[in-house]
Amino acid sequence: MYGNPIHPGHIECLMLSKELVDELWVIVNNDKQAELKRGVPSFQDEEYRKTIIESIRYVDHAEIAIDQDGSVCETIELFYNKIKSLDPDSEIIFTKGGDRFANEIPEKVVCDFFGIKIVDGLGLKTHNSSDMVKY
């Protein structure tokens, strides 16, 4: 989740994601990823965004992505290993917002490899962070 800035669409996605799981773990895209996405440095750094995301009531854990490309494949593997070490029988679900679909994301390969279910299209695409930061 870039959350740069957080808007109601992000909150809706988190709320709907939390309805699917006992504990919601959120990946916060890092500063390098934010710059790759927009072509300019993020106006809210990764720690700032992580602090905001952690404060949302639906979120149980948040960590900054370790990936250096635009995906979160390596971070999914890290989460998978952490979660399975805590509860080997837990089902892990990777969720995406209203404008992201499983067959279009690079994370599908790692999710398929680890048997992680993907639930996409969570929430309506009612807001766009890019539009919010334009003057």
Predicted regions and their residues:
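Nucleotidyltransferase catalytic core that binds NTPs
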Residues: 1-135
